[in-house]
A protein has these predicted regions:
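Non-catalytic surface loops within mature trypsin-like serine protease
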Residues: 107-109, 273
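Acyl-donor binding region in acyl/amide transferases
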Residues: 4-5, 37-97, 207-263
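Short, surface-exposed, charged/polar-biased interaction segments
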Residues: 53, 124, 172-175, 179, ...
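Short secondary-structure capping/turn micro-motifs that flank functional sites
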Residues: 149, 254-255, 272-273
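Secondary-structure boundary/capping residues
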Residues: 138, 186, 243, 264-265
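Conserved catalytic-core motifs of GNAT/GCN5-like acyltransferases
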Residues: 98-102, 263-273
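A conserved beta-strand-loop-helix scaffold within acyl/acetyltransferase catalytic domains
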Residues: 1-45, 85-102, 109-223
Length: 273
């Protein structure tokens, strides 16, 4: 199915990505292709705070026996992945728990259709926010880059944020994002204006669509919604490029729904062998 493809084509299932996020696993963990073994438990590679989707794991009884595995604890799985895991006859007990929610936006062929698909209230709100932005900003341009200069802007906007968001960009996290940007198909979309770069979106773009992994904004401009304005421009650009989806990934921030996103339930799986 399309959803299945969207999850399995996401960056989070790719070898070079898993190679990068394994640093978040325990030092003692034994890392395999798409899972790790921690003690006697099969777990995911990479912390769920950083990894939005998971590869579908194919585990055979040999793995269990050779590594004296007695449990499987996996997170952030899609429904189709749970179904596949449950076809295994070896399990003693299974617990499936609703966990994170991701938000996804399917894109039509025309931007006009996208606007029509929004609820009347959301369409009205979007227009109001765009007018407010244009009233304050004389010129703007949507650009994309893998350059250090824009990466530094992304990082410093994070560090200047208030509250939790300001604490997010530690030295390790910064190094992780810097390495991520070096991988194929990762880039930063940014909104360049006569008043500087007001917002950025750290994305992975595939042939079929775009995954919004993280974002930042210049807090001086919060009152004119630079994030919404940027996302709207990205949506227009993706539609022009013929992309099928804009995946907002994990987290239920309101703006994702305001822009027409639909929630996608993810699950955690606890298995005893």
């Amino acid at each position: 199915s399309f959803v299945e493809k969207q999850v399995l084509d996401s960056p989070f299932t790719k070898k070079e990505y898993l190679n990068l996020v394994k640093q978040f696993n325990d030092r003692q963990d034994e890392i395999f292709d798409d899972f790790a073994i921690s003690g006697n438990t099969i777990v995911n590679i990479g912390n769920r705070e950083f990894v939005d989707y998971r590869p579908t794991i194919d585990i055979n009884s040999e793995t269990f026996i050779n590594n004296s595995v007695s449990k499987i604890n996996l997170d952030s799985l899609h429904y189709f992945q749970i179904k596949k895991m449950l076809q295994n006859e070896l399990f003693k007990s299974i617990v499936i728990k609703k966990s994170d929610i991701a938000v996804n936006l399917m894109l039509p062929d025309l931007y006009e259709d996208y606007l029509q698909n929004l609820t009347k209230k959301n369409r009205h709100e979007l227009n109001r926010k765009k007018r407010k932005f244009s009233d304050q900003i004389d010129s703007f341009e949507l650009l994309e880059s893998k350059e250090k200069e824009i990466f530094d802007t992304f990082v410093s906007q994070h560090k200047k944020s208030k509250g939790e968001k300001g604490k997010f960009m530690t030295k390790d996290t910064e190094a992780y994002f810097e390495n991520l940007l070096k991988l194929d198909d990762w880039k930063i979309y940014y909104l360049k204006t006569n008043k500087g770069v007001v917002s950025t979106a750290f994305c992975y773009e595939s042939k079929k669509g775009c995954y919004l992994y993280n974002s930042s904004r210049d807090n001086k401009f919060n009152s004119i919604n630079p994030g919404i304005f940027l996302n709207d421009l990205i949506i227009q650009r993706l539609i022009q490029k013929g992309k099928c989806f804009f995946d907002f990934l994990k987290g239920t921030e309101r703006y994702k729904f305001d822009l027409g996103g639909q929630s996608v339930q993810l699950y955690d799986l606890y298995i005893k062998l």
